[in-house]
From Swiss-Prot:
Keyword Methyltransferase: no
Protein family according to the UniProt entry: Belongs to the universal ribosomal protein uL1 family.
Protein name: Large ribosomal subunit protein uL1
Single GO MF descriptor: structural constituent of ribosome
GO cellular component terms, semicolon-separated: cytosolic large ribosomal subunit
Pfam families noted in UniProt: Ribosomal_L1 (PF00687)
Protein function: Binds directly to 23S rRNA. The L1 stalk is quite mobile in the ribosome, and is involved in E site tRNA release. Protein L1 is also a translational repressor protein, it controls the translation of the L11 operon by binding to its mRNA.
Gene Ontology annotations of biological process type: regulation of translation; translation
Top-level taxonomic group: Bacteria
InterPro entries per UniProt: Ribosom_uL1_bac-type (IPR005878), Ribosomal_uL1 (IPR002143), Ribosomal_uL1-like (IPR023674), Ribosomal_uL1/biogenesis (IPR028364), Ribosomal_uL1_3-a/b-sand (IPR016095), Ribosomal_uL1_CS (IPR023673)
Natural source organism: Burkholderia cenocepacia (strain HI2424)
Keywords: Repressor, Ribonucleoprotein, Ribosomal protein, RNA-binding, rRNA-binding, Translation regulation, tRNA-binding
Quaternary assembly: Part of the 50S ribosomal subunit.
Amino acid sequence: MAKISKRRQAFAAKVDRQKLYAIEDALSLVKECASAKFDESIDVAVQLGIDAKKSDQVVRGSVVLPAGTGKSVRVAVFAQGEKAEQARAAGAEIVGMEDLAEQIKAGQMDFDIVIASPDTMRIVGTLGQILGPRGLMPNPKVGTVTPDVATAVKNAKAGQVQFRVDKAGIIHATIGRASFEPTALRSNLSALIEALQKAKPATSKGVYLRKIALSSTMGVGVRVDHATLAAQ
């Protein structure tokens, strides 16, 4: 534990916590700090200019990251008939109806995301207390309740991430792994920021994107000058 602390302190000394770094410099620093023995995730925190206490200013959605997430995702789908076949063909590991619901109630949840066809919500709705706290409850706002289950499965497999503002008005998301090239991380971050811009509440006033900070799993936060992110 002491070694981790010393390593973190060494990297923290390299980062000016008050400085806004150009995106290329920020990514370079974050990747340098990601020196653990595993492939650390690269995470972003975005402070939004919204009042998270107001229901009309809750920012939520999803985006497919162009370079993927670097993570293998297991998908469960509630569907029947032709839609069930389409889900399987798209790569879903688990497809079912009442049988899948019973597995979930029994604690068998070997999946990372749940997708549901609208006609199955009578079944899925009974699982809210189980799936909700785990962040797995299907929701049309993030594209996991949809008649086009095949596309939803493909998106999940391709690197779709869901985002939702927390009580402090901050969005947290993973945009890749330390092993990713800087260009891949930048394209993923750009896609996320674009999705956040599109999700901006009409009632939000003033500066919307207030702060952007990058970090690795074991690293320190590096603030980003998002004007450099927009520059090509």
